[in-house]
Amino acid sequence: LPREFMARENDNIVASDEHNSRGIELADRGWLDEAIKEFKKAIDLDPDSAHAHDNLATVYAEKKLFREALGEYLTALKLEPESPTAHYNLACFLSTHAGEMAVAEYREAIELDPEYPDAHLNLGLTYADQGRIEDAMRELQTAIELDPQDAFPRHELAALLMDEGDYRSAITQLKEVVRLDAENFEAHLDLGICYAQKGFYAEAERSYEKAKALNAEDLLLNYNLAALYALWGRRADALAFLQKAVTVDRQKVQGWLATDTMFDSLKGDPEFDALF
């Protein structure tokens, strides 16, 4: 390359580094918009400056411009694929902001198409993961209204209602789930749990029987059947199903029993104690 071209290129790199340094100072002071301008100038002067792309990405992330941030992190990585820092920074961004970014994109999808059931469903699931239970329930309810024949959002809503202790509302959803999907083992099991919690033992037994027809060896099913019969005062049945559960995973069952009041009527019974 001609010497003057190389000199000009070096001048650009020096100037780029100056803008980059100024951008860092501004970002540290919280002047994010000004910092963005400096990092962009640095990139204009030296498009291959991975650290300028990286710094720009960090400021974008702080401003919650997640799509722009992701683009800059990926550019930095493309420029320096062997850089541990580039991989580390991208990983930090994803682990910190992936949930927030997903929410923003789902909401954008819904804004563009308000009657998009899967977008409402997945937004609801993301809210649930973030502990935003009321928001999650609202989105799942919308997904159900938009696609009443889909059992999945109903089951997810029922699970949230169960966690909140609203077994009556969960039962309403789960009855629909098993009507729409009669082979859904988990739904029959959950319906049985809800009925048992409300004191409807015969209904609980019927739901557990349907679950048993689909998977008789399931640990949770046998444990819950034992709990139901213990509450119901059917000692022999309770012990028989508890024995089945213990055979599958003794340690797990012991852990559950440590805090489970449903088995209080059996504690101290020689046959119950003999299981352990």
Predicted regions and their residues:
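Structural signature of tandem alpha-helical TPR/SEL1-like repeats
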Residues: 28-41, 62-75, 94-108, 128-142, ...
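TPR-adjacent "capping" and linker segments in tetratricopeptide-repeat scaffold/adaptor proteins
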Residues: 2-18
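Conserved alpha-helical positions within TPR/SEL1-like repeat arrays
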Residues: 17-28, 51-62, 85-95, 118-129, ...
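Alpha-helical protein-protein interaction modules
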Residues: 165-168, 172, 179, 183-276
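Short coil loop/turn residues that delineate tetratricopeptide repeat
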Residues: 14, 48, 82, 115, ...
